[in-house]
Amino acid sequence: MNRYTTIRQLGDGTYGSVLLGRSIESGELIAIKKMKRKFYSWEECMNLREVKSLKKLNHANVVKLKEVIRENDHLYFIFEYMKENLYQLIKERNKLFPESAIRNIMYQILQGLAFIHKHGFFHRDLKPENLLCMGPELVKIADFGLAREIRSKPPYTDYVSTRWYRAPEVLLRSTNYSSPIDVWAVGCIMAEVYTLRPLFPGASEIDTIFKICQVLGTPKKTDWPEGYQLSSAMNFRWPQCVPNNLKTLIPNASSEAVQLLRDMLQWDPKKRPTASQALRYPYFQVGHPLGSTTQNLQDSEKPQKGILEKAGPPPYIKPVPPAQPPAKPHTRISSRQHQASQPPLHLTYPYKAEVSRTDHPSHLQEDKPSPLLFPSLHNKHPQSKITAGLEHKNGEIKPKSRRRWGLISRSTKDSDDWADLDDLDFSPSLSRIDLKNKKRQSDDTLCRFESVLDLKPSEPVGTGNSAPTQTSYQRRDTPTLRSAAKQHYLKHSRYLPGISIRNGILSNPGKEFIPPNPWSSSGLSGKSSGTMSVISKVNSVGSSSTSSSGLTGNYVPSFLKKEIGSAMQRVHLAPIPDPSPGYSSLKAMRPHPGRPFFHTQPRSTPGLIPRPPAAQPVHGRTDWASKYASRR
């Protein structure tokens, strides 16, 4: 033992304690199992079951016994070091394992168990604590302290393994059991790895049998006659239970996993498959080298690789042909396609994996050991191909068809990603906007109330171009919006008496005034500075900057103004008792209530209704009270 140094204690068992050590020569980490009882001869040591079994077992999924040392009547086993056991791996897990990782773990356990059974031993104490791991990628069977040779003669002791993983024949105190008890324990461990909880957590042996009955249902006498003999021998009365569906108890297990579980958890040990038979179940036939690292990552990567490698006729996308560089829409299609083709992780189980494999028969022929796996999924695939083709036939991509596997028409434009505005097809609305802009430029400037409400794309405030903005594109000209806004506008008066209009003119009008484009009125300006800016704008319309259309570029309708401060609150005013004498002469010029009040010059443009003249300012003031007197 002077060739090893001990670092710390890893665990303490019934027959010995385990220490973490290091080899002084190589620096390799090792596990030292120190037996609690003393051994006074080598013959006594060599008769130990653990030594007998481990001397004969050399397998990748069986923990390796490096050396046996007897020193001062103490016996030490030197094992290879493993980071953790399966119980610790399950306990530290905060989310469920992917099925590919579970399949890999169970495959390694059954491989090691088949090797042990083949060499004439059965373990008798399989539980998560006795399965040593280096993460989920590598699992090895350890602790052969209770191992027995299969050819050894009964009776055996009735206490074997931890109660939760004990087979029903052992719970009923049978003394004639064999390797099927290990298969039962593997079934219990498999369910626990899926759910992260024990399947039969009984508080006692009888309670464990009750737990088994609640899951599997009460066995019939014809199904397991030996079980009824054992129960009558110990005066045990079977509870009457209805079997539960394992799929409902383990919802994240596939149908192949449930099939394997159901067979390993048979009441009758003769009906359970052997470990080598379990390895041939469809659950392990997944078309890749078994025992490799997690299948889930391969499943999620295969669709991407297939899309990048595949080059076919026009319905498929080629990865940037060198001779003819594609236009921008096509480059966007390819980039979006790779994103959409990634299946979600929680849906990658058999269906997604099979879809990706059916797309690429070359991969299937290379990797798959068996010719046909999951036949029902193959039958579904052509239908999904047809629907994908029809989906893109009309040049439309609906947002619900997010997952595609490479079938996209060349002429379509991918607009699935609504977060990217460059992908939106603005062509119909832009052509309509350009026609209207030409019509407006050919005619004189058109100023009517509908144009204010029709929030068509126009130039933003302070800029000279007419590129449509996102806000203006999304607000469409609908009759309900127009009528609702008109009622909102006509219902509220902005006239506040007692305020000097002349003093309300801004000292720096350059910030408020905009280049004289009569259609910039539909764009929203910056934050209003209260009622004074509104009145000053109206004053400037009436006095200084009245254009040929009677509307300046900086006019902002009141229904678009943000109500800020106490001066911008909606105020209903009483009639003014003593209006100015000059106001009475303007009552005849008051516009019709149903018509907008802006002044436009008469023109012969078809489809436009001539408007009555707007009220002219008197002494620099607009008669707002006379305008809205009838509306009060």
Curated annotation (Swiss-Prot):
Its cofactor is Mg(2+). Residues 4-284 form the Protein kinase domain. It is found in: Nucleus; Cytoplasm, Cytosol; Cell projection, Cilium; Cytoplasm, Cytoskeleton, Cilium basal body. It comes from Homo sapiens. Coiled coil: none annotated. Its main location: nucleus. Required for ciliogenesis. Phosphorylates KIF3A. Involved in the control of ciliary length. Regulates the ciliary localization of SHH pathway components as well as the localization of IFT components at ciliary tips. May play a key role in the development of multiple organ systems and particularly in cardiac development. Regulates intraflagellar transport (IFT) speed and negatively regulates cilium length in a cAMP and mTORC1 signaling-dependent manner and this regulation requires its kinase activity. The keyword Methyltransferase does not apply. ATP binds at L10, G11, D12, G13, T14, Y15, G16, S17, V18, K33. It catalyses: L-seryl-[protein] + ATP = O-phospho-L-seryl-[protein] + ADP + H(+); L-threonyl-[protein] + ATP = O-phospho-L-threonyl-[protein] + ADP + H(+). The lineage of its organism: Eukaryota, Metazoa, Chordata, Craniata, Vertebrata. This is Serine/threonine-protein kinase ICK. The modification Phosphothreonine is found at T157.
